[in-house]
Curated annotation (Swiss-Prot):
Family note: Belongs to the PanB family.
Residues that hold 3-methyl-2-oxobutanoate according to the record: D71, S72, D114, K143
SUPFAM superfamilies: Phosphoenolpyruvate/pyruvate domain (SSF51621)
Classification lineage: Bacteria, Pseudomonadati, Pseudomonadota, Betaproteobacteria, Burkholderiales
Domain of life: Bacteria
GO annotation, biological process: pantothenate biosynthetic process
Protein name, entry field: 3-methyl-2-oxobutanoate hydroxymethyltransferase
Subunit structure: Homodecamer; pentamer of dimers.
Length: 296
């Protein structure tokens, strides 16, 4: 059987004339040195969650620097009440899916995967085994939640070649201990503790730090105090080195009410890629988040 001849550009088709193909822009793969250069230049880092190959490819094409395979997939994909029920096998499955999506389009995004609940609490050795599972699935970095008690684990992983993103403030894996989804670090004592924990994690080698639902002033202070650790805010104001949102929240397709810190970029975009591009542009230009609307 003879293969069909590809339709050339500018040829007439039943649907109109095909436009000439535009060359894909040449982009360098995102790396830790590249993220450091961006921060030094004052350019905001953009991050979104991704859970499958197609959305990963679209987000990468829209210019997102970092993709997070978050255990939030338990809530937005599996319908679980929290992230606690997400397994390591599930995280590896979705990480591999996202990695394949990036590979198919020669994507450049930096890929981070969450270490799920129960996969690192026993100590550094357990964390290393779990991290190896996610790195072998295609992750470039792993993320774990928790304060100073995780610092020895962070150091252990970094010394063995595993880049680590830490996570302070509201830590969804321990939401039951925190009494619900509440802003963290509001009291003077809590703010001091968060600053101290952030310094510990930077000293242990964490290259990135997610700050979730933390007062904007505190998040800015922490960011200024961490020259070697890039802060990524979600509900933490505009003063962090970058921003992250759950993909479903920024597309307005979650199962409940959109959180205060999110914005529905799909409402005016008309397409998924357009919405993600609008998010990237808004973060880069300093229009999102608006501290008066999206922060505490």
């Amino acid at each position: 059987m003879t293969a069909p001849t590809p339709t050339p550009a500018n040829a007439a088709t039943p649907y109109g004339t095909l436009p000439p193909a535009s060359p894909l822009p040449q982009r360098r793969p995102v790396s830790l040195p590249r993220l450091a250069q961006m921060r030094e230049a004052g350019e905001k880092i953009t991050m979104l969650t991704a859970y499958d190959a197609t959305f990963a490819a679209v987000a990468d094409a829209a210019g997102v620097e970092c993709l997070l395979v978050g255990d939030s997939l338990g809530m937005v994909c599996q319908g679980l009440p929290s992230t606690v029920g997400v397994s390591l096998d599930t995280m590896a499955y979705h990480t591999a899916s996202v990695a394949r999506g990036l590979h198919r389009v020669q994507g450049t995004a930096w890929l981070i995967a969450d270490l799920p609940y129960g996969s690192y609490a026993e100590g550094p050795e357990q964390a290393m085994r779990s991290a190896c599972t996610l790195m072998q699935a295609g992750a470039h970095m792993v993320k774990l939640e928790g304060g100073g008690w995780t610092a020895p684990t962070v150091r252990f992983l970094v010394e063995r070649g595993v880049p680590v993103c830490a996570h302070l403030g509201l830590t969804p894996q321990t939401v039951h201990a925190l009494g619900g989804y509440r802003v963290q670090g509001r009291s003077d004592e809590a703010a001091r503790a968060l600053r101290s924990q952030a310094n510990e994690l930077q000293d242990a080698g964490a290259a990135m730090l997610v700050l979730e639902m933390v007062p904007a002033t505190l998040a800015r202070e922490v960011t200024d105090a961490l020259p070697r650790c890039h802060t990524i805010g979600i509900g933490a104001g505009s003063g962090t080195a970058g921003q992250v949102l759950v993909l479903h929240d920024m597309l307005g397709v979650n199962l409940g009410k959109n959180p205060k810190f999110a914005h529905d970029f799909m409402a005016q975009a008309g397409s998924v890629r357009g919405a993600i591009e609008a998010y990237v542009q808004a973060v880069k230009a300093g229009r999102f988040p608006d501290d008066a609307l999206h922060a505490w």
